[in-house]
Every structure is written in C-alpha cells, then in structure tokens.
UniProtKB/Swiss-Prot annotation:
Residue(s) at site: Important for substrate specificity: S187, V242
Residues bound to phosphate: S22, R65, H66, S98, A99, S206
Domain of life of the source: Eukaryota
Family matches, as PROSITE patterns: PNP_MTAP_2
Family of this protein: Belongs to the PNP/MTAP phosphorylase family. MTAP subfamily.
Protein name: S-methyl-5'-thioadenosine phosphorylase
Pathway as given in its UniProt record: Amino-acid biosynthesis; L-methionine biosynthesis via salvage pathway; S-methyl-5-thio-alpha-D-ribose 1-phosphate from S-methyl-5'-thioadenosine (phosphorylase route): step 1/1
NCBIfam families documented for this protein: MTAP (TIGR01694)
Length: 315
C-alpha cells in the first residue's frame, strides 16, 4: 500500500512512537496514512517515519530501528536522530520492540518479556547523550536513570500483553533485567554465563542508548521483547545463530501483531493529556539535570538542543 510522502505533519496529534526491531519492519495491525523524513541536528532517522492510524483512530509514528532492509548494525543505529525525530513530531511515549536472547530456562523462545532494568555492556562506541560526545563542545547534564523504563506504562503494557496472549501458548514475563551488549557478534559461552551471575535475564544489542536518549528527550519509554533463543549459556545445546533467531521471529508474527493492536491504543489512554502520570512525571525533568550555566553554553549546542527542547538555555 503506497502512502503520500509529506514534508511536515499538520494532522491529528502524534503522541505515540513505535520503534520496530529485528523482524519488525512494518506493522500489519495499523493503517499507514503518510510517510515523512525529518532532518535533525544529528542526521536522519534509520528509516522514513510512517504515520499510521490504530484501530481506535489514534495516530502513531513508526520507524524501523535497523532500517527497512535491516542494513544498519546495532552499533551504527542513528539513535539520536531517531529519538529527536520522534520528539519533533510531538511523541510523548515510545513503545519499542526487540528480539532478545534468553538467559533463563523459564523464558523460552517465543515468550514475551517486559523488562524493568538494564545492564550496560556497550563499549563507548555509541553516542549515548544529546549533551555531548568526544571532543564536541558539551553541556554537562546528568539525567536520572535509576528506573530506565517508564514505571507508569510498564505494568500497563505487561498486563495488556498478558491479557492479549492469554489464549496462546506463550508466556509473558516482567520485572526482568536486559543486558545490552555491543555486538554485532553474539556472546561467548563464558560471557553468557557471566551475565546470568550478574542477574541478567535477557540480552540484546539495541535498548541502549535508545532508552537513555528517550529519557533526555523527556519521552516515556517501554520495551516489549520477544525471546528468540537461549543465547550461549546452555552447555548441552548449540549457541545462538541468525537462522534460529529469524525462525522464532517468523513464528511470532501473529502474536506480535495482536500485541501491537491492543498495546498501542491502551498506552494512548495514558498519554493523551499532560496531566497523565506517564507524561507529567517526566516533563521538565531535563531542566533539573543541567549543570552548565546557560551563559557559557556554546551557541551550536544551544541551537541543536533547542530542536529537542525549545526552552533550552533561554534565560
């Protein structure tokens, strides 16, 4: 189905963003109405953004994290541009999807997981803040990240996914910890076993810096993970490979579309006004994380950050 390409959006509010991971390059459960490419100070997003309507008539913005042809390595995903583009459209919450490896016997391939915590095993290759990187003139800001996922939306997403899949032979887990590794190679067996001793329950290559940047952008963020394999910690079985991952994802297409249909409209009800906790609890949080005095912030940094936060350094 072809949709018109637009240069700006003046239609109904787009409060919800959806980021698709491996195997999820489009959503069959929503109706595309337009496509838009947004230029940000940090470049272009991974893919053109599809503006679509849910079954309840709510407009959402969808982008494919690795591009529509899955041509972008995890370490090379333009995370800043992705988050900034969604913020520019007015997005207040993001529901992100990701394929993950399981580090626990009870989390079987094809199960869904709504994690609550993250262990960062990326290696400093990926830029993880809008406020500076490397030799760039920076602004010192320390966003709170103790609870990396929105604690208002996370239990709602969990209960919605659980209810949606109640008649399916698929378990739904929550209060789990996701390890984010650098990749693109999968774990060694020693690493996989180590992550288990650290308290890791699932593992992927994508949740960071995505979740950190969403926090800096004051966007509520929640992850829906689909287990595809048992990583490499089980000594009696073969280590994970791409064929196994893709087989699990294909088998879960129906469940993923069912989940999407229900979750998006349910989350919308929690963000449709600024007084709802999911929005209110994060709004203006960035203002209180900045330590650099506005009068010494470089003009270029001010210009870039105002794309994200129009109020930035105007005093």
């Amino acid at each position: 189905m072809s949709v018109p390409t637009v240069t700006s959006w003046t239609g109904a509010p787009i409060l919800l963003g959806v980021i698709g991971g491996s195997g999820l390059y489009k959503l069959d459960s929503i109706t595309p109405v337009a496509e838009i490419s947004i230029s940000t100070p940090w470049g272009s997003a991974s893919s053109p953004i599809t503006i679509a309507k849910t079954s309840a008539g709510n407009h959402v913005a969808f982008l494919a994290r690795h591009g529509r042809d899955h041509a972008i390595l995890p370490s090379n995903v333009p995370n800043l541009a992705n988050i900034a583009a969604l913020k520019h459209l007015g997005v207040k919450a993001i529901v992100a999807f990701s394929a993950v490896g399981s580090l626990r016997e009870e989390i079987a391939p094809k199960d869904f997981v709504i994690p609550s915590q993250i262990i960062d095993r990326t290696k400093g290759v990926r830029r993880a803040s809008f406020f500076g990187f490397g030799d760039e003139e920076s602004v010192v800001a320390h966003a709170g990240f103790g609870d990396p996922f929105c604690e208002t939306l996370r239990p709602i997403v969990y209960s919605t996914v659980q209810a949606t899949l109640a008649s399916h032979p698929i378990k739904v887990h929550t209060d789990k910890t996701v390890v984010c590794m650098e990749g693109p190679q999968f774990s060694t067996r020693a690493e996989s076993l180590m992550y288990r001793t650290w308290g890791g329950d699932i593992i992927n290559m994508s949740v960071l810096p995505e979740a950190k940047l969403a926090r800096e952008a004051e966007i509520a963020y929640v992850l829906i993970a689909t287990a595809t394999d048992y990583d490499a910690w089980r000594p009696s079985t073969a280590a994970v490979n791409v064929a196994e991952v893709m087989e699990s994802l294909k088998a879960n297409v129906e469940a993923s579309n069912l989940v999407t249909t229900k979750v998006l409209d349910r989350v919308w009800l929690e963000i449709d006004t600024d007084e709802k906790p999911a929005v209110k609890n994060i709004k203006d949080s960035t203002k209180f994380s900045i330590m650099t005095k506005s009068q010494v912030i470089p003009d270029k940094a001010k210009q870039n950050l105002r794309f994200l936060h129009p109020w930035f350094a105007r005093d």
